């Protein structure tokens, strides 16, 4: 890591062309696959097929030597593709697959460098020493509790994937000016796409690439999402600007929709930047809130249904003319918040209406006033969690606990630790649920699955195993909410523990929730 920082300091005067030579440095590949150095990298390390730490240095030297050879990338991807579907030599397939993944990982590592340095310098300028709490997943839920109760409509958006990799490279070209590096990246993606297109359809090409090159695809996809979110922020600023004027409404130009059909990509951007305040129509009070998670997004508004339809129309046109993506109408659903429940970041969220009557007394007369209050509610999606547990082989599809045969070779303490970690993570993440009954069911499935796994290992029944060792064996990984609340709320508020199953707690230390499939 010191070598990399020294290289960056040395090339600070010529930042336009410092990325390409890094492809021929050994420490870049060591950095990409060394789990001990992943603290400075954004994403978690990706396991390489058949990767062996003992032979890594030899393979890296061999890879760098082959990079200098002519037509290396073509033969590399071609060998990997042929060996995948034809009878192949295992060693050749290992080396071709390893080299392909090493190059993909090194591309991702190198291209992250300018953005990581920019991020660190930004927080140093803003003097934000503890910015990790801002990354907490739970930090968005208090915001939604405060804002969604005052809004009317929500658009559930499924962000489309770009059709061709060239679009992703063009987006990246706006941020990185290293021409040789971009040419090599474009060539690698082009050959990968062409050789895979002979075997799979074009729609599945990006899907296969995302599975085999997770880190690089994630970076390119985030750049693509950032580009269209920049468009969204621009429109939002225009609407805020229009709100400050004295006029109550702005009418759109008559021929705007006819003009936009003939615009090319660059022309469309020019129109957006120069004439949006004259061509788009916004309501007097367009309160908008946008949240993105994974490949989906939510756009909530206090405006009318007509305003939401116009946002939907502009999204479709932007995707079509700027990214060349033909998006189907089912990708954006407009719903009224009071009648809609949506699956959001592991929770089933909805807006509940509470009707109550308030007695008002004026002098000798008294009368009742009906009031309606809105409350943002989050519950545990039991069906989705049971599906994840079933996919990870902890239970059946109907929720019946089963043993985990693949873990029977582990020690008892390792089995307890694995089940305990999953149970604590789920309990910690879903602490914001207003109803804990569903979470108790998930805990019961994990507890009984752990007991069945231990009983299978010792060739005994669950009842006999628990009777011999005691039921307290499984209680050490089962953290109750009362224990957590007792740490947060000391003896000054003893009454809160009585209704702890209804209390919602949002934590600021949750960066991500592990997929249960990873524990299989």
From Swiss-Prot:
Usually encoded in the trnK tRNA gene intron. Probably assists in splicing its own and other chloroplast group II introns. Belongs to the intron maturase 2 family. MatK subfamily. GO terms for molecular function: RNA binding. Signal peptide: none annotated. Its main location: plastid. GO terms for cellular component: chloroplast. One of its GO terms (biological process) is tRNA processing. Keywords: Chloroplast, mRNA processing, Plastid, RNA-binding, tRNA processing. Disulfide bonds: none annotated. InterPro entries: Domain_X, Maturase_MatK, Maturase_MatK_N. This is Maturase K. It is found in: Plastid, Chloroplast.
């Amino acid at each position: 890591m010191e070598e990399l920082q020294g290289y960056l300091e040395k090339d600070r005067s010529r930042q336009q062309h410092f990325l390409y030579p890094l492809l021929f440095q050994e420490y870049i590949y060591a950095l990409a696959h060394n789990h001990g150095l992943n603290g400075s990298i954004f994403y978690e390390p990706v396991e390489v097929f058949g990767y062996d730490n003992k032979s890594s240095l030899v393979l890296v030297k061999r890879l760098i030597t082959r990079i200098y050879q002519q037509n290396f990338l073509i033969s590399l991807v071609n060998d990997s593709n042929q060996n995948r579907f034809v009878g192949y030599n295992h060693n050749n397939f290992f080396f071709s697959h390893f080299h392909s993944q090493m190059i993909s990982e090194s591309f991702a590592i190198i291209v992250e460098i300018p953005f990581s340095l920019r991020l660190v310098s930004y927080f140093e300028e803003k003097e934000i020493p503890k910015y990790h709490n801002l990354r907490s997943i739970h930090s968005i839920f208090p915001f939604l509790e405060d804002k969604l109760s005052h809004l009317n409509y929500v658009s559930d958006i499924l962000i489309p994937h770009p059709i061709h990799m060239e679009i992703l490279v063009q987006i990246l070209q706006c941020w990185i000016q290293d021409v040789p590096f971009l040419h090599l990246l474009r060539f690698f993606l082009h050959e990968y796409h062409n050789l895979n297109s002979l075997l799979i359809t074009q729609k599945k090409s990006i899907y296969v690439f995302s599975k085999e090159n997770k880190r690089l695809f994630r970076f390119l996809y985030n750049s693509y999402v950032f580009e269209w979110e920049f468009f969204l922020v621009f429109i939002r600023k225009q609407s805020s600007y229009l709100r400050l004027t004295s006029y109550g409404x702005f009418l759109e130009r008559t021929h705007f929709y006819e003009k936009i059909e003939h615009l090319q990509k660059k022309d469309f951007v020019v129109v957006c930047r120069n004439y949006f305040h004259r061509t788009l129509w916004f309501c007097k009070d367009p309160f908008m809130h946008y949240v993105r998670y994974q490949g989906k997004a939510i756009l909530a508004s206090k405006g009318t249904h007509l305003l939401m339809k116009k946002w939907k129309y502009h999204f479709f046109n932007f995707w079509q003319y700027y990214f060349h993506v033909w998006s189907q109408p089912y990708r954006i659903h407009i719903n009224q918040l009071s009648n809609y429940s949506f699956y959001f970041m592991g929770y089933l969220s909805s807006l509940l209406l509470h009707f109550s009557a308030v007695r008002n007394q004026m002098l000798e007369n008294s009368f009742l006033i009906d009031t309606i209050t809105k409350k943002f509610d989050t519950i545990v999606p039991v069906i989705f969690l049971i599906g994840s547990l079933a996919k990870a082989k902890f239970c059946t599809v109907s929720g019946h606990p089963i043993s985990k045969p693949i873990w029977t070779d582990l020690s008892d303490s390792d089995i307890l630790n694995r089940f305990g970690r999953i149970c604590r993570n789920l309990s910690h993440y879903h602490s914001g649920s207003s109803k804990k009954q569903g979470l108790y069911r998930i805990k019961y499935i994990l507890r009984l699955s752990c007991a069945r796994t231990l009983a299978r290992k010792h060739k005994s029944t669950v009842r006999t195993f628990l009777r011999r060792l005691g039921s307290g064996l499984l209680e050490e990984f089962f953290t109750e909410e009362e224990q957590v609340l007792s740490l947060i709320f000391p003896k000054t508020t003893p009454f809160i523990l009585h209704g702890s199953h209804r209390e919602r707690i949002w934590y600021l230390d949750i960066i991500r929730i592990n997929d249960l499939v990873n524990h299989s």
